[in-house]
UniProtKB/Swiss-Prot annotation:
GO terms for molecular function: fluoride channel activity; metal ion binding. Its main location: membrane. InterPro entries: FluC. The keyword Iron does not apply. This is Fluoride-specific ion channel FluC 3. The lineage of its organism: Bacteria, Pseudomonadati, Pseudomonadota, Alphaproteobacteria, Hyphomicrobiales. One of its GO terms (biological process) is cellular detoxification of fluoride. Fluoride-specific ion channel. Important for reducing fluoride concentration in the cell, thus reducing its toxicity. Belongs to the fluoride channel Fluc/FEX (TC 1.A.43) family. Na(+) is not transported, but it plays an essential structural role and its presence is essential for fluoride channel function. The keyword Heme does not apply. Signal peptide: none annotated.
């Protein structure tokens, strides 16, 4: 029994690690594309990945949760939610961006950026919930 649990834990670790690697690569590439399209301001890339990641994690969590239609393995659930979304989103970059704005004398903009990003990320999560609930019906 113990060996089975260890093997299952190893599967979860590998799933999270692979998902995180893909999520981090997607974060880097999407940031690069967003900056190329909208300009050199890194706030756009950070905002984009956090908003999209919030939608994805809530959408997937709702579809694969106890009331969800999709039955997936714990490894796949951790791959998407812990790995992919964890690697894609970036709280640390948001914190760095906010503090850099404050340090450069843009405290009001920093507050607006922080509040706006939290609001938009939570709104995206709500949209993910609503979309998945419609599929679950």
């Amino acid at each position: 029994m113990r060996n089975w649990r260890q093997a299952e834990n190893i599967r979860l670790y590998i799933a999270v690690g692979c998902g995180a690697a893909i999520g981090a690569l997607l974060r880097f590439l999407s940031g690069w594309v967003i900056v190329a399209i909208l300009g050199a301001n890194p706030l756009w890339g950070t905002s984009f990945v956090n908003i999209v990641g919030s939608f994805i994690i809530m959408f997937f969590a709702t579809l694969t949760g106890p009331e969800g239609r999709w039955l997936v393995s714990p490894a796949l659930r951790q791959f998407v939610m812990g790995g992919l979304c964890g690697g894609l989103t970036t709280f640390s970059s948001m914190s760095l961006d906010t503090f850099l704005l404050v340090l450069h004398g843009n405290a009001a903009f920093a507050l607006a950026y922080l509040c706006g990003l939290v609001f938009l990320s939570l709104s995206a999560a709500m949209l993910g919930l609503i979309a998945a609930q419609r599929i679950n019906r």
